Structure formats: structure tokens, C-alpha cells
Swiss-Prot record:
Compartment list: Nucleus, Nucleolus
GO MF term list: methylated histone binding; methyltransferase activity
Name of the protein: Ribosomal RNA-processing protein 8
InterPro entries associated with the record: RRP8, RRP8_N, SAM-dependent_MTases_sf
UniProt-annotated binding residues for S-adenosyl-L-methionine: H169, G204, D224, D236, M237, C253
Source organism phylogeny: Eukaryota, Metazoa, Ecdysozoa, Nematoda, Chromadorea
UniProt family annotation: Belongs to the methyltransferase superfamily. RRP8 family.
Cellular component terms (Gene Ontology): chromatin silencing complex; nucleolus; rDNA heterochromatin
PANTHER family according to UniProt: RIBOSOMAL RNA-PROCESSING PROTEIN 8 (PTHR12787:SF0)
Keywords linked to the UniProt accession: Chromatin regulator, Methyltransferase, Nucleus, Repressor, rRNA processing, S-adenosyl-L-methionine, Transcription, Transcription regulation, Transferase
Biased composition (Basic and acidic residues): 7-33
A biological-process GO annotation: regulation of transcription by glucose
UniProt source species: Caenorhabditis elegans
Methyltransferase among keywords: yes
Enzyme Commission code: 2.1.1.-
């Protein structure tokens, strides 16, 4: 290559094309000037665009290695507190949720206590203990019978053997002692707040405790499969010996036990006046779906006016009789039986 020189000679300049001369001057100018830092960085970026990508991958790999070395330290994620998180904290402060009460479980616990007492042969009477076990077995049989047959079949069964009904109620009373509360007390308080001389039908009354408590304030008629005392009228709950529209209030307190629930609700509607109240109290664990159960009753000619749960164990419902009946056998009127496990 020859030495670089400027084109200053006029003769030389005449023989060199103008376009080529301009390119040569620009090249000489750039070669003599020092490039700026920004220009050099731009050139580096153009020449090595893969460098940043390699650095990012290396940083990610280093973070992953650090995380594997310290697995106990979770990554710190800063997020705004949601309402669901606050609700969860509140629930934790309240403590563990109460278990739903089931009569069959309470009955099993009662029998376990009896077994513990029987474990001491020096104090327990073997004959009395054998009788107690026999009565417990008969109670389980009678309880299952009531939940798995119709009201008319149960009425005929106890009509032939009234002593079986006494044994059942004695066993039921023993189970009630283990319950944390009883909805019957709530119903009695509710009746005491009502105006005097209401016509009240207590269906499946047992020993007619409502008539005993508020019999002077209201006109109480107590019905059950067997009359255990003078206050009770024996009958089938689906065929009440009463006229149409003769009751202001009809009560089913833990007494919807047969398989023909539709007949029981229809009979309650028949004897109620328009605007009369149907009061139902049942064990919460028996409901397949509380919503569907209430909707089924409303379709049978009622309007729901009140519903609440009593200490997670019992459900209290209140309906008013209306004129229109949408369906005679609507879907959803189902209750699970309370069956006590055999031991």
C-alpha cells in the first residue's frame, strides 16, 4: 500500500473522480478522529448482542443454585393482602369449627360409658347389665323400624305391642340426656311469647311436654303413635282426627321419622288455617339439602318465614300456609335416618 496523502494537487484532483475523492476524504477524516464513548458502546452492542443474554442466563442459574442450597428459606413475595386472607386469619382466631352433633354418636358414647361401668365386676350387677344391653338392642331395633317404615305401619306395629313404645321412649330419653341442648325448650319459649288461646297441634309429642308447659295459655292437642298419658291422643300422623283448618300452629319437633314425609306435610297443611304456622325442628345432620327441603315444603302450599340453626346441632324452620299449592310431591323432601350402630 502506498502512503496516505491529501489530494491537494490541482492536476491530480482533475484526474480523480469527485465521488471517489469525497469517499477518500471522509475515510481520512474518520481515521484521524477519536470515537466517543457512546459510539464505541453502540458498536460493541452491535458486534456482541449475545452478551446480555448470556449474563441473564448466568444470573438465573446462580439464583437457582442458591435456592437449592437454602431450601428452607422461601422466596419473599410482596403481594397486597386480599380479603380472603383476612377472613382466613379471622377464622383461625375463632378456633376450630365445632363438629356437628349426631344423636347416634351421642348414643354410642352413652353405651361406651355403660361398658366402662360394666368393666368393674365387683360393683356392677351382671343381671342388670344384661338387661340394660338387651334394652339397648331393642331400642336400636325400634328406632330403625320408625325411620324405615311408613307412619301407618308404625302405628299398627305399636298398637299390637304398646310396651315396645314405652321402651323406645325410655331409650330416647336416655339419649336426650347426652345432648347439649333440646329444641323443645326453644319451642316452649316461642309459644309463651304468642297471644293466648292459640290452637296448637303437637305431632309426635312423646310425653306431651308442650301441653304440660303451656297447656293453660294455649289449646294444645298432642298426638303420637301411642298415648303414654292422658294428654296424648294416639293416631297415625298422616291421618289426624281433626277437622280441616282447625289449627293455628302445627309442630313437628324431632318427629318426622317415617318414610312418607309428603303425607305428614300434607296433613299438617290440611288442619292448618290460612296463615297458620308450621314449625319444624330437626337434627341438622339429617338433611340431605336444607335448601331443597325448604323449597319442597314451600311448593306444597307454604311460605317460609323463618329458619335458623341452634348451636350447629338442630335446625329450626317456620312456614306459613298459603292458598296456592304448586306441587303435591316436589323434589327434595328428604331426611336421612338416625340409625344407631350395633355393638
Amino acid at each position: 500500500m502506498g502512503k496516505k496523502r491529501k489530494i491537494t494537487d490541482e492536476k491530480d484532483a482533475q484526474h480523480v473522480p469527485a465521488e471517489k475523492r469525497e469517499k477518500v476524504e471522509n475515510w481520512l477524516k474518520k481515521s484521524t478522529e477519536k470515537p466517543t464513548s457512546s459510539q464505541s458502546d453502540a458498536e460493541k452492542k452491535k458486534k456482541r448482542p449475545w452478551r446480555n443474554k448470556v449474563r441473564k442466563l448466568a444470573a438465573k442459574k446462580a439464583a437457582a443454585d442458591k435456592k437449592s442450597e437454602n431450601p428452607e428459606e422461601p422466596p419473599l413475595i410482596l403481594e397486597p393482602k386480599s380479603s380472603s386472607d383476612e377472613n382466613t386469619k379471622k377464622k383461625r382466631k375463632r378456633g376450630p369449627k365445632k363438629k356437628k352433633f349426631k344423636p347416634e354418636v351421642a348414643g354410642k358414647a352413652a353405651e361406651t360409658e355403660n361398658d366402662d361401668v360394666a368393666a368393674a365386676p365387683e360393683e356392677a350387677d351382671p343381671i342388670a347389665e344384661a338387661k340394660k344391653r338387651l334394652d339397648a338392642g331393642r331400642f336400636r331395633f325400634l328406632n330403625e323400624k320408625l325411620y324405615t317404615c311408613t307412619g301407618s305401619e308404625a302405628f299398627d306395629f305399636f298398637k299390637e305391642d304398646p310396651t315396645a313404645f314405652d321402651l323406645y321412649h325410655k331409650g330416647f330419653a336416655d339419649q336426650v340426656k347426652k345432648w347439649p341442648n333440646h329444641p323443645l325448650r326453644e319451642i316452649i319459649r316461642w309459644l309463651q311469647s304468642k297471644p293466648d288461646q292459640q290452637s296448637v297441634f303437637d305431632l309426635g309429642c312423646g310425653e306431651a311436654k308442650i301441653a304440660e308447659a303451656v297447656g293453660e295459655k294455649h289449646k294444645i292437642r298432642s298426638f303420637d303413635l301411642v298415648a303414654v298419658n292422658d294428654r296424648v291422643e294416639s293416631c297415625d300422623m298422616s291421618k289426624l282426627p281433626a277437622e280441616d283448618s282447625s289449627a293455628d300452629i302445627v309442630i313437628y319437633c324431632l318427629s318426622l321419622m317415617g318414610t312418607n314425609l309428603y303425607d305428614f306435610i300434607r296433613e299438617a297443611r290440611r288442619v292448618l288455617k290460612i296463615g297458620g304456622i308450621l314449625k319444624i325442628a330437626e337434627v341438622t345432620s339429617r338433611f340431605v339439602s336444607i335448601k331443597q327441603f325448604c323449597e319442597a315444603i314451600t311448593k306444597m302450599g307454604f311460605e317460609q318465614s323463618h329458619r335458623r340453626e341452634l348451636t350447629d346441632y338442630f335446625m329450626m324452620m317456620e312456614f306459613k300456609k298459603v292458598e296456592k299449592v304448586e306441587q303435591k310431591r316436589p323434589y327434595g323432601l328428604k331426611l336421612k335416618p338416625c340409625l344407631y350402630k350395633k355393638r
